[in-house]
Amino acid sequence: MAGSIDPLRAQFDAFKALPRDTPIQMLNLVRLNALAAYPEGHPNHGKGMSGLDAYRAYGRTSAAVFKRVGGRQIWVGEPEGVVTGPADEHWDLAFIAEYPDAGAFLAMVTDPEYREHVKHRQAAVEDSRLIRFAPVEAGEGFGE
């Protein structure tokens, strides 16, 4: 079964239908390919680059666009194991990116410079989850 690397059209349309003028936080869960899967014709095709190295290239090359739209990474964790969920599900990277509003995220993913750099992410990722959240003030107990 192919992993989720890029959003489906219906998912992206649903994202765009949500409010665009409020802050958002995006939970990223990423499972990497052992070897990056660059397409033929890409300068890194066949070089034996790891998925992690390709993802780091994505992070480095897209950082200027991410910063330009006002994005910032607010949490990073190293996944250690699944406590609840499919036993065979694992993630290599986990982080939350925050944007001043959904419009900033849309500006980033449609930016021509970013679209060139995202090829590293596409080569790096075997499977991923990207989940949008509206930031809220935490309460005293779980779910509050």
List where the protein language model places each region.
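Short S/T/G/P-rich N-terminal loop/turn motif that feeds into the first structured element of a domain
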Residues: 1-93, 100, 104, 134-144
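Short, Lys/Arg-rich amphipathic alpha-helical interaction segments
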Residues: 96-98, 102-144
